[in-house]
Amino acid sequence: MSPQTETKASVGFKAGVKDYKLTYYTPEYETKDTDILAAFRVTPQPGVPPEEAGAAVAAESSTGTWTTVWTDGLTSLDRYKGRCYGIEPVAGEENQYIAYVAYPLDLFEEGSVTNMFTSIVGNVFGFKALRALRLEDLRIPTAYIKTFQGPPHGIQVERDKLNKYGRPLLGCTIKPKLGLSAKNYGRAVYECLRGGLDFTKDDENVNSQPFMRWRDRFLFCAEAIFKSQAETGEIKGHYLNATAGTCEEMMKRAIFARELGAPIVMHDYLTGGFTANTSLAHYCRDNGLLLHIHRAMHAVIDRQKNHGMHFRVLAKALRMSGGDHIHAGTVVGKLEGEREITLGFVDLLRDDFVEKDRSRGIYFTQDWVSLPGVLPVASGGIHVWHMPALTEIFGDDSVLQFGGGTLGHPWGNAPGAVANRVALEACVQARNEGRDLAREGNEIIREASKWSPELAAACEVWKEIKFEFEAMDTL
């Protein structure tokens, strides 16, 4: 190496370790429209100032490392570094802070949720200077959103495909989730669809096990779909779970579903991964398939209040990666979901523009620039007595999914489906007539049960069933 080269490489470089906040804490920074903005809940280790903790998050999730390196001089850190531009204490929590970080758009590959998360929620979550770290929200700039296809079809196109308007869609997860033969599984699908449901569903862990191989299941479910359509005159569907051990196998299953004429397939997007999910979403758009998304594994990531990632971030990522439905909690059922927080990310899934609203956990205004919306799916421990609340909470653009609440009917699967359809139609009619579903819900169901023996039987079975536990996910 020549002396001249040595001089150039060493200009401005001083080996050693320096505080992150000297480079990455920039409270004077004015965010750009093209920045990805993140709100982190930071719990520093004792003795670590919040500014240093916030700067460490910005550094370790962008250009920084634990020591000064001479190759910093070969690029422009001011152009590429993440910046912690704000710190605020969390009300009611000791030693917790919201750190706001801005990332230049050039740090991220176009159209890749995988790359975005690898940076923002990568190694930094194991950083020793932090006791805990949670990503509460992201603002995705419109310039980045435009690099994503998003949902294969979206809410309006799905309604047009199904020719169903003015009410929530009804679904059912086939139970028991594991152990049925393909023929008996298909029989249950047929009975539920014939009884009045729009969709039935594979459970998240129904893939291709020894008791029921995927191809057999697809064939019997397709038979059930077409038979129930012929009898009812309505378009029906079954979420055929294409999730598999490899992307190649997943695509093979999706292709077979299309060849059978199935209208919709399904993917477990967190266990399957964002790369696989985006690939499947692209195939579904190109081939006219709807895509149902299950969020299995989400609670491992989002349930702890001070560490991990809030589901609203996973919901935004899914809208970018692609899916026409996603499970979003119920508020009233057996699974976690506080009302205002749930409605916050439901709006982020469906609406084109969502204003900042800290009372619902929304830290940033989000403009989706006409990216198609996603139908939220309410599923888990719900039954006919929940129908008024679900209709009032989620509105028409949703899927209400009753597994045990259909298949647990004392008269069988088809009467269980009838009970749910009657309850839904009664609630929609009452709402359209101006009645208050929140206040008059039980009375509306009781009135409908007088002329529907199937609904009356369901009301009797589940009149005492409640899931009253305190929500973990609060503001």
Curated annotation (Swiss-Prot):
At which residues is there a site annotated Transition state stabilizer? K334
Sites binding Mg(2+) sit at K201, D203, E204
N6,N6,N6-trimethyllysine: which positions carry it?
A: K14
Maturation and modification: The disulfide bond which can form in the large chain dimeric partners within the hexadecamer appears to be associated with oxidative stress and protein turnover.
What InterPro entries has UniProt attached to this entry? Answer: RuBisCO (IPR033966), RuBisCo_large_chain_AS (IPR020878), RuBisCO_lsu_C (IPR000685), RuBisCO_lsu_C_sf (IPR036376), RuBisCO_lsu_fd_N (IPR017443), RuBisCO_lsu_N_sf (IPR036422), RuBisCO_lsuI (IPR020888)
The subcellular localization recorded is:
Plastid, Chloroplast
Q: Which residues carry this modification: N6-carboxylysine?
A: K201
Q: Name one GO biological process term.
A: photorespiration
Point out residues bearing the modification N-acetylproline: P3
Q: Which residues form a coiled coil?
A: none
Write out the GO cellular component annotations: chloroplast
User: Which cofactor(s) are needed, names only?
Assistant: Mg(2+)
Give the record's cofactor note, including how many are bound.
Binds 1 Mg(2+) ion per subunit.
Q: Which reaction does it catalyse?
A: 2 (2R)-3-phosphoglycerate + 2 H(+) = D-ribulose 1,5-bisphosphate + CO2 + H2O; D-ribulose 1,5-bisphosphate + O2 = 2-phosphoglycolate + (2R)-3-phosphoglycerate + 2 H(+)
Q: What's the chief localization of this chain?
A: plastid
Pfam families in the record: RuBisCO_large, RuBisCO_large_N
Keywords assigned by UniProt, alphabetized: Acetylation, Calvin cycle, Carbon dioxide fixation, Chloroplast, Disulfide bond, Lyase, Magnesium, Metal-binding, Methylation, Monooxygenase, Oxidoreductase, Photorespiration, Photosynthesis, Plastid
* Propeptide span(s): 1-2
What residues bind substrate, as annotated? N123, T173, K177, R295, H327, S379
What binding partners and quaternary form does the record give? Heterohexadecamer of 8 large chains and 8 small chains; disulfide-linked. The disulfide link is formed within the large subunit homodimers.
Further remark: The basic functional RuBisCO is composed of a large chain homodimer in a 'head-to-tail' conformation. In form I RuBisCO this homodimer is arranged in a barrel-like tetramer with the small subunits forming a tetrameric 'cap' on each end of the 'barrel'.
What is this protein's function?
RuBisCO catalyzes two reactions: the carboxylation of D-ribulose 1,5-bisphosphate, the primary event in carbon dioxide fixation, as well as the oxidative fragmentation of the pentose substrate in the photorespiration process. Both reactions occur simultaneously and in competition at the same active site.
Concerning PANTHER family, the annotation shows: RIBULOSE BISPHOSPHATE CARBOXYLASE, RIBULOSE BISPHOSPHATE CARBOXYLASE LARGE CHAIN
State what protein this is by name.
Ribulose bisphosphate carboxylase large chain
- Organism listed in the record: Cucumis sativus (Cucumber)
